[in-house]
């Protein structure tokens, strides 16, 4: 049974441009799915509709069988985490630890549990030795792993990655693959927008 569904979804920007028209998709838990296509094909708009950053003009998005219209954007984001293409659009704290821990701190979780979760996630993302560093002491490509960690640590059911391999070297791309496999092993849905066909061939069985 699909956990995340788009049913006949359409979206038009205020300037009149129709970015998504009558799109239907289904995603089951434990799936790893690549979304490919030309620039301007509506890929990022589509995943923003999944995450609640945008709302459909027609059709509906269902998460766990419930329409996202019943939830605020913040409530949707707890279940559908979205890692932006540009990490600098999501980094606001003055240390990598604080950036990863931010959502947990807002949840009221105790410090010991936060420390444990942050360290586990930082290790997964190759950041365990730089937690006290300022995020901008790391390269642009490494900052992508900070934003991935900040989403993964919140344990959403769906993780959306927008062009995660852009600007990454081979080792970093391999780490991305390991992170995605770790997530799907936990029965999470991983949806990745990418133009990296080598990455698609290596990591994905399902491509949209």
Task: Cite the ranges covered by each PLM segment.
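The feature captures the beta-strand-to-loop junction immediately N-terminal to the Walker
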Residues: 36-38
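Helix-to-loop junction immediately C-terminal to a conserved catalytic motif
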Residues: 51
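Conserved ABC transporter NBD signature motif
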Residues: 59-67, 76
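Conserved ABC ATPase "signature" region
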Residues: 112-130
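Conserved ABC ATPase signature
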Residues: 134-138
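Catalytic Walker B motif of ABC-type/P-loop ATPase nucleotide-binding domains
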Residues: 159-162
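H-loop/switch region of ABC-family ATPase nucleotide-binding domains
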Residues: 194-195
């Amino acid at each position: 049974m699909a956990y995340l569904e788009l049913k006949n979804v359409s979206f038009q920007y205020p300037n009149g441009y129709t970015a998504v028209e009558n799109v239907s998709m289904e995603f089951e838990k434990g799936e790893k799915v690549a979304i490919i296509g030309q620039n301007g094909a509506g890929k990022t708009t589509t995943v923003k509709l999944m995450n609640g950053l945008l709302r459909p003009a027609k059709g509906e998005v269902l998460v766990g069988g419930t329409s996202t219209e019943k939830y605020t954007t913040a409530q949707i984001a707890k279940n559908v985490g979205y890692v932006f293409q540009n990490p600098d659009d999501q980094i606001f704290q003055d240390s990598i630890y604080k950036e990863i821990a931010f959502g947990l701190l807002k949840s009221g979780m105790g410090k010991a549990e936060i420390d444990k979760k942050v360290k586990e996630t930082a290790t997964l993302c190759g950041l365990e030795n730089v937690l006290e560093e300022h995020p901008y002491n790391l390269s642009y490509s490494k900052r992508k792993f900070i934003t991935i960690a900040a989403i993964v640590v919140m344990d959403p059911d769906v993780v959306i990655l927008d062009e995660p391999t852009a600007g990454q070297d081979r080792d970093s791309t391999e780490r991305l693959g390991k992170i995605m496999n770790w997530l799907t092993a936990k029965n999470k849905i991983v949806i990745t927008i990418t133009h990296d066909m080598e990455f698609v061939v290596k990591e994905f069985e399902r491509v949209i």
